[in-house]
Amino acid sequence: TFINVKCTSPKQCLKPCKDLYGPHAGEKCMNGKCKCYKV
C-alpha cells in the first residue's frame, strides 16, 4: 500500500508503516513515496 509520506530512504517509512500495520510492517521507499506491506 502506498501512503502519502515522502521519503528518500525506507527508514523514513518505518514509523508510519508501523502505525498502519503494527509491529510486523514492512516498508519500502519507491519513487519518493513510502510503500507499506504486512509481513
Swiss-Prot record:
Name the site position(s) for Basic residue of the functional dyad. Answer: 28
Q: In which tissues is it expressed?
A: Expressed by the venom gland.
Q: List the disulfide bonds.
A: 7-29, 13-34, 17-36
Query: Where would you say this protein principally sits, based on its record?
Result: secreted
Show which residues form the site (Aromatic residue of the functional dyad): 37
An example of a Gene Ontology cellular component annotation for this protein is:
extracellular region
Subcellular location, in the record's words?
Secreted
Q: Please name the Gene3D superfamilies in this protein's record.
A: Knottin, scorpion toxin-like
The source's superkingdom equals Eukaryota
Q: Which UniProt keywords apply?
A: Disulfide bond, Ion channel impairing toxin, Neurotoxin, Pharmaceutical, Potassium channel impairing toxin, Secreted, Toxin, Voltage-gated potassium channel impairing toxin
- MF term (GO), any: toxin activity
Q: What is known of its domains?
A: Has the structural arrangement of an alpha-helix connected to a beta-sheet by disulfide bonds (CSalpha/beta).
The text of the family note is: Belongs to the short scorpion toxin superfamily. Potassium channel inhibitor family. Alpha-KTx 02 subfamily.
Q: What does this protein do?
A: Blocks human voltage-gated potassium (Kv) channels Kv1.1/KCNA, Kv1.2/KCNA2 and Kv1.3/KCNA3. Exhibits high affinity for Kv1.2/KCNA2 and selectivity over Kv1.1/KCNA and Kv1.3/KCNA3.
Q: What is this protein called?
A: Potassium channel toxin alpha-KTx 2.24
